[in-house]
């Protein structure tokens, strides 16, 4: 549920992006008030979670394994792990898309179609 304010308040975005440009795009949408739901791979999440230093520090000032880049590029987002390669995960994505206003992805052309999640499958 989105209780944020901003130009995109009330807009729901499904974020199937990873690494640099995609997360930055959805970061800006979240900064403008959109409810961004980031989908990550089970077990490892976005590749940038472990990008090189600087790392975020914990309450005791010790470095964690969470990269500052990841935390910045994924602010104003909710995150959930969903396995896109499983039928159950694909069904969850389809249900989320039905309720969403926007889907942003930056996979190689055709990759999501292999899982029944391409543009023609979801439009």
Model-derived regions, located:
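N-terminal helix-loop segment corresponding to the beta1-alpha1 unit
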Residues: 1-123
């Amino acid at each position: 549920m989105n209780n944020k304010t901003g130009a995109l308040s009330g807009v729901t975005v499904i974020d199937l992006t990873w690494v640099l440009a995609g997360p930055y795009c959805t970061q800006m949408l979240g900064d403008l008030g959109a409810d961004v739901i980031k989908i990550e791979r089970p077990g490892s999440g976005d590749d940038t979670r472990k990008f090189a230093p600087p790392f975020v520090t914990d309450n005791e000032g010790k470095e964690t394994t969470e990269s500052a880049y990841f935390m910045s590029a994924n602010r104003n987002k909710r995150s959930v792990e969903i396995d896109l390669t499983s039928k159950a995960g694909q069904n969850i994505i389809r249900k989320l898309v039905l309720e969403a206003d926007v889907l942003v992805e930056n996979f190689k052309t055709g990759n999501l179609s292999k899982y029944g999640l391409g543009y023609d499958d979801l439009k």
